[in-house]
From Swiss-Prot:
Reactions this protein catalyses: L-leucine + 2-oxoglutarate = 4-methyl-2-oxopentanoate + L-glutamate; L-isoleucine + 2-oxoglutarate = (S)-3-methyl-2-oxopentanoate + L-glutamate; L-valine + 2-oxoglutarate = 3-methyl-2-oxobutanoate + L-glutamate
Domain of life: Bacteria
Keyword line: Amino-acid biosynthesis, Aminotransferase, Branched-chain amino acid biosynthesis, Pyridoxal phosphate, Transferase
EC number: 2.6.1.42
Pfam families: Aminotran_4
Cofactor: pyridoxal 5'-phosphate
Pathway field: Amino-acid biosynthesis; L-isoleucine biosynthesis; L-isoleucine from 2-oxobutanoate: step 4/4; Amino-acid biosynthesis; L-leucine biosynthesis; L-leucine from 3-methyl-2-oxobutanoate: step 4/4; Amino-acid biosynthesis; L-valine biosynthesis; L-valine from pyruvate: step 4/4
Protein name per the record: Probable branched-chain-amino-acid aminotransferase
Residue numbers bearing the N6-(pyridoxal phosphate)lysine modification: 160
GO molecular function, one term: L-valine-2-oxoglutarate transaminase activity
Keyword Transferase: yes
Gene Ontology BP term (one): carboxylic acid metabolic process
Function: Acts on leucine, isoleucine and valine.
Length: 311
């Protein structure tokens, strides 16, 4: 079962090993308390060039290291070193298809006190066959969740802390059990925060609006890339401000962004059609630019990409 989803090799306790050997004890501290920091990274296969491109590799590892330090984890690697390790795993696994990369930093100590000091941090990296996380071709139906996004003064959403994703799991499960594809969470002030694992944008009168980082959201790497594409390629004004729940229903278009979600249109929220209930024109254009950029098909955005194979 493991083989059908995960790839052959992983980075574990300082070396690349067969993925079956990358195992932790059930007594591992972070397993009990969620005191781990993770990232999600995609690599895209370009068939014409026969090249695998890692998207925003350095940026993801820089964020992981920054977030890890916030949990008092001092990892003995630079972002550049982690990128090289990731390339080596991909090459050793002979990956020639789209793949998801999951790095996770955790405390490996076999102790049961919920604290962040006097423990030993470790980092693991593995590969995963992922495919589409949500339906980017037809759009999805979303539900505004009864669960509120974590407040920055409890567990900051700007950090990818494993334990904080119970909040996401509650919201996502509620949405799925109610017949929807995804959840949209409000923050403690009642404004729109984000999806269970995605940032959110609305389009109104030709302008893109998205919650600012102060609205208890993850400062998404894909979010930043999408803002760049909207401004430079589509010449769409982008405003960062609080979004009221009711603005979701009156938006012309809504879409979600994230490493996993990529650019996912939302065509219905709480049984209300968004616009005409189909993917909007700005979202369609944005998707075209984004999917071409991540596969290395737009030269000016190859700076976002790290090639894996030497040519």
């Amino acid at each position: 079962m493991l083989k059908s989803f995960s790839m052959d090799f992983a980075f574990f306790e300082g070396k690349i090993v067969p993925v079956e050997e990358a195992k932790i004890s059930i007594m591992t501290n972070s397993f009990h308390y969620g005191t781990a920091i993770f990232e999600g990274i995609r690599a895209y296969w370009n068939e014409e060039e026969e090249q695998l491109y890692i998207l925003f590799a350095k940026e993801h590892y820089e964020r992981l290291l920054t977030n890890a330090r916030c949990l008092f984890m001092e990892l003995n690697y630079s972002a550049e070193e982690l990128v090289e390790i990731t390339k080596e795993i991909l090459r050793k696994s002979e990956i020639r298809e789209d793949v998801y990369i999951r790095p996770i930093a955790y405390f490996k100590d076999l102790k049961l006190t919920p604290k962040l000091i006097d423990y030993t941090p470790e980092i693991a990296i593995y590969l995963y066959r992922f495919g589409r996380y949500l339906d980017t071709s037809k759009g999805i139906r979303a539900k505004v969740s009864s669960w509120r996004r974590n407040d920055d003064n409890s567990i900051p959403s700007r950090w990818k802390v494993a334990g904080a994703y119970v909040n996401s799991a509650l919201a996502k499960t509620e949405a799925l059990m109610s017949g929807y594809d995804e959840a949209i969470l409000l923050n403690s002030q009642g404004y729109v925060a984000e999806g269970s694992g995605e940032n959110i944008f609305i389009i109104k009168n030709g302008k893109a609006i998205t919650p600012s980082p102060n609205e208890h959201i993850l400062e998404g790497i894909t979010r930043n890339a999408v803002i760049t594409l909207l401004k430079k390629e589509l010449v769409v004004e982008v405003e960062e401000r609080p979004i009221a729940r009711s603005e979701l229903y009156t938006a012309d278009e809504v879409f979600l962004t994230g490493t996993a979600a990529e650019v996912t249109p939302v065509v219905e929220i709480d049984n209300r059609k968004i616009g005409n209930g189909e993917i909007g024109p700005i979202t369609k254009q944005l998707q075209e630019f984004y999917f071409n950029a991540v596969r290395g098909k737009i030269q000016r955005y190859k700076k976002w990409l790290t090639p894996v194979y030497d040519k």
